[in-house]
Structure formats: structure tokens, C-alpha cells
Amino acid sequence: VDNKGTMTVTDPESIGIQVDGDQAVVNNEGESAITNGGTGTQINGDDATANNNGKTTVDGKDSTGTEIAGNNGKVIQDGDLDVSGGGHGIDITGDSATVDNKGTMTVTDPESIGIQIDGDQAIVNNEGESTITNGGTGTQINGNDATANNSGKTTVDGKDSTGTKIAGNFGFVNLYRSLTLPGGAHGVANSGD
């Protein structure tokens, strides 16, 4: 699926693009605005790839920019990602998932998560600049054998704000650039063996 236009999705159960099946590829070139419980792109199947080159804005509880349910899912986020109000920018459920985040990521408000992966052997590469504020979470991985590589500048500010959180055994976070933590925030939270 090649989406080159602007996508606006609002309200629960509304989905901009839905693909059911293995080895799906979705290319989002234009801007996406997802609000009030909607989902921009949803892929159900193994070996899926989503390429997001345009800016993605996600606002509101249960709103999700890109969602993949299946093993070996991959999201390449070249465009900016702005998440607020309890939304999720990227949400993958399945083992061996990979996210390459090359754009600027801004996450604000409690329960807001820029990137969430539920599954083992996940890899997240944050290469762009990240700003996490007001109780938001930049990257959250729930599963064993996870790796987060943070090579971009990260600023985390505000109570309960977290840059990278891993819940599972044998998780690794590699920091290659500056991490700024004013205001009672957490840069890295790793729970597990």
C-alpha cells in the first residue's frame, strides 16, 4: 500500500489503512493525524513492514499511529513523531520486532508512549532527537532479550517521564549520545534479570 496523501483518522475503531496477511508493506509518505482512539495503520500478519516518511501526530487515549500484530514486524519512522494525551505512536505485538526511529520524537502526558513493543527479541534504534515530558514514555519494551540503541540526543523532563523502559530478562540499553534529565525524570528503567 502506497499512501502519498494526508491521512486523518479520528474516533474509536476508525482505521486509516488495514492490511490482513503476511509480508505486507505499507508506505506512508504524507502527514498523518490520529486522534480520539483512532488507528492510522494496522497490519495483522507476520513479516510486515511500515515505512513512515511523513510527520505522524497521535493524540488521545487508545489512539495509535502504526500498529503491527505479528512476528518479525518492522517500522521505519523517518518522519517526525508527536504523541500526546495517552496515545501510542508505534505499537508492535510479536517477537523479533524492529523499530528504526530516525525522525524527531516528542512524547508528552501520562500513558503516552512513542514506541511500544510486546514480545521477545525486540530491537529499537532511536537515531533522532527525542523529547519526553509530563509523564510520557519514549520507548517501552515488554519482553525478554530486548535491545534499545539510543544514538540521538534525548531529553526527559517531568515527574514519571521515562526515556527508555524495558520489562523483561536480558534487556540492554545502549546510550551513544547525551541524556538530559531535569525535573525528576527517569532516563532508563530496566526491570528483569
What are these regions (language model features)?
Residues 1-13, 25-37, 49-62, 74-86, ...:
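Beta-strand-rich solenoid/repeat architectures in extracellular/passenger domains
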